[in-house]
Amino acid sequence: MPRYGFHLSIAGKKGVAGAVEEATALGLTAFQIFAKSPRSWRPRALSPAEVEAFRALREASGGLPAVIHASYLVNLGAEGELWEKSVASLADDLEKAALLGVEYVVVHPGSGRPERVKEGALKALRLAGVRSRPVLLVENTAGGGEKVGARFEELAWLVADTPLQVCLDTCHAYAAGYDVAEDPLGVLDALDRAVGLERVPVVHLNDSVGGLGSRVDHHAHLLQGKIGEGLKRVFLDPRLKDRVFILETPRGPEEDAWNLRVLRAWLEEA
């Protein structure tokens, strides 16, 4: 059965531990967080008490799968100081994931040269001393400009002969020209041929405000965007039955209730 959840906040006194509490309260079976502010280079220290509380709460919840999303400032395709800062920031997220016992770290490749993206991702793994866990996932992008990773073939090159794996974002794929609305299984087939679905442990299950091939990275709530029911076929595809599905849409009691109602209705239909 797929595991599912939201991107949760770590703001407040409880920090990362508060995210586990919220996930449990909402009945989620997975969750995603930032390890620090997504719009600051400043690292965020984790106290031993915060780490202990996070680990204990996850264990008590049955070990909810967790994902850390790297900072939005990271651009592994850049040059010079920006590239160095991006690699250091990603390494910091990987170190925190290892400390917390988090399984996955997701990063946007950025803009520039694919060779720099691959080099930067591998350097971050080395700096963090990561061997097998956490797994670093490169997320597909909506494309436009010099953004790296909009095409599945480019993702395949980025992860080839490395420990890197892939995070599929359905909104980004649709915006990049993959018709998740009308041919979701064909899109998964294309990803399988290029990368191998066994190397896609996490899916960002987002609907899309923008149209097919629009290059617009604007997420919508389930069934409230241009993809619609195509997302159900992705969510329930047997090839993805044990994957982690994360929704990255604006949070609120009504919005959460809607998205959970849709996901749980889909599971009942399966």
Swiss-Prot record:
Entry GO MF terms: deoxyribonuclease IV (phage-T4-induced) activity; DNA binding; DNA-(apurinic or apyrimidinic site) endonuclease activity; phosphoric diester hydrolase activity; zinc ion binding
CDD domains from the UniProt entry: AP2Ec (cd00019)
A biological-process GO annotation: base-excision repair
Keywords: DNA damage, DNA repair, Endonuclease, Hydrolase, Metal-binding, Nuclease, Zinc
Sites where the protein binds Zn(2+) 1: H69, H108, E139
Keyword check for Phosphoprotein: no
Enzyme type, top EC level: hydrolase
Cofactor: binding details: Binds 3 Zn(2+) ions.
InterPro entries: AP_endonuc_2 (IPR001719), AP_endonuc_F2_Zn_BS (IPR018246), Xyl_isomerase-like_sf (IPR036237), Xyl_isomerase-like_TIM-brl (IPR013022)
Record's catalysed reaction(s): Endonucleolytic cleavage to 5'-phosphooligonucleotide end-products
Residues noted as binding Zn(2+) 2 in the record, renumbered to the chain: E139, D169, H204, E248
Pfam families attached to this UniProt entry: AP_endonuc_2
Keyword Transport on entry: no
Annotated residues for binding of Zn(2+) 3: H172, D217, H219
EC number: 3.1.21.2
Necessary cofactors: Zn(2+)
PANTHER family associated with the record: APURINIC-APYRIMIDINIC ENDONUCLEASE, ENDONUCLEASE IV ENDODEOXYRIBONUCLEASE IV
Function according to Swiss-Prot or TrEMBL: Endonuclease IV plays a role in DNA repair. It cleaves phosphodiester bonds at apurinic or apyrimidinic (AP) sites, generating a 3'-hydroxyl group and a 5'-terminal sugar phosphate. In addition, possesses a 3'-5' exonuclease activity.
Family, as annotated: Belongs to the AP endonuclease 2 family.
The name this protein goes by in its record: Endonuclease 4
Lineage: Bacteria, Thermotogati, Deinococcota, Deinococci, Thermales
